[in-house]
């Protein structure tokens, strides 16, 4: 059995509410942990921010005009959405981990595992880092 088969998933209504800040039941903590700290979490969060922006901007494309006018109407609004979703990604994921009573440091877990060999090589070459309190 795969991990997804035993991990409870939110229903569509719960998922929509969760995407925009609602808390899921404790039975779904493993799913939340994987969603917010697992592989691809940053991209998932950016997509969740972009979807409402695209839905709001889509009617502008129904106005009969040229492509450059369409782009000049929508891109100045869409680009900041994408920019801020990237800039505030870890902040929002840490907040959502706290909301679900999970450790906010899980956000960096994937990067720590990915870069562990770099830290080991540094310690082997230069020794452990000095304690700043000494």
UniProtKB/Swiss-Prot annotation:
Source domain of life: Bacteria
Topology in the lipid bilayer: Multi-pass membrane protein
Keyword Lyase: no
Pfam families with a match to the protein in the record: DUF5313
Signal peptide feature range: none
Subcellular location: Cell membrane
The protein, known as: Uncharacterized protein Rv2742A
Organism: Mycobacterium tuberculosis (strain ATCC 25618 / H37Rv)
């Amino acid at each position: 059995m795969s991990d997804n088969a035993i991990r409870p998933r939110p229903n569509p209504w719960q998922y929509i509410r969760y995407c925009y800040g609602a808390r899921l039941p404790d039975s779904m903590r493993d799913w939340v942990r994987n969603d917010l700290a697992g592989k691809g979490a940053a991209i998932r969060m950016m997509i969740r921010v972009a979807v409402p922006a695209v839905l709001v901007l889509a009617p502008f494309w129904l106005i009969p005009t040229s492509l450059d006018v369409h782009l000049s109407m929508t891109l100045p609004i869409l680009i900041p959405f994408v920019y801020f979703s990237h800039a505030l990604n870890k902040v929002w994921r840490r907040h959502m981990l706290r909301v679900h009573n999970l450790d906010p440091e899980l956000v960096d877990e994937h990067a720590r595992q990915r870069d562990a060999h770099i830290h080991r090589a540094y310690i082997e070459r230069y020794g452990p880092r000095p304690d700043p309190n000494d």
